[in-house]
């Protein structure tokens, strides 16, 4: 529990790890400001660590500080521009902040680096849906369900995608493949 972590003697740990553990514990107690203060201490020890910045942004997201989270994720992306996890978090923050076009671009970039993240695929489907591209939302949802082994659900969404996408296009072919595999 958070109270145990905050009360524990931690002199043997590095300063940044102590600060990180306190930040997480404080965030679980709903003390965002104090949690962010602890993260700043950790970042002072390791200022170029993109994952400390990612955690900072994630805590902002969990507390619905979407605009601040976007800014924090931009710093993390600057430190690790090819990291799919950080890109996905940035895309999620953009989506939550209603920056749909930027979210779609960022989430597609993240997907090009890691196509197996079901959380990323869920966010990408939402971005497509909010961009008025329901056929692409259906395709990405079908992919996500197929990756999860939920072939019946994948079939439903692949069929929707096949019906809405231009026949013969790469996206249509992918939807057709998922539909074919999921009907067996």
Give a label for each model feature:
Residues 40, 50, 54-135, 139:
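Alpha-helical adaptor scaffolds
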Residues 1-78, 106, 136, 150, ...:
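Extracytoplasmic and endomembrane cell-envelope/extracellular-matrix remodeling and assembly machinery
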Residues 82-88, 92-104, 108, 112, ...:
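Hydrophilic extracytoplasmic domains
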Residues 25, 141-144:
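Generic low-polarity alpha-helical segments
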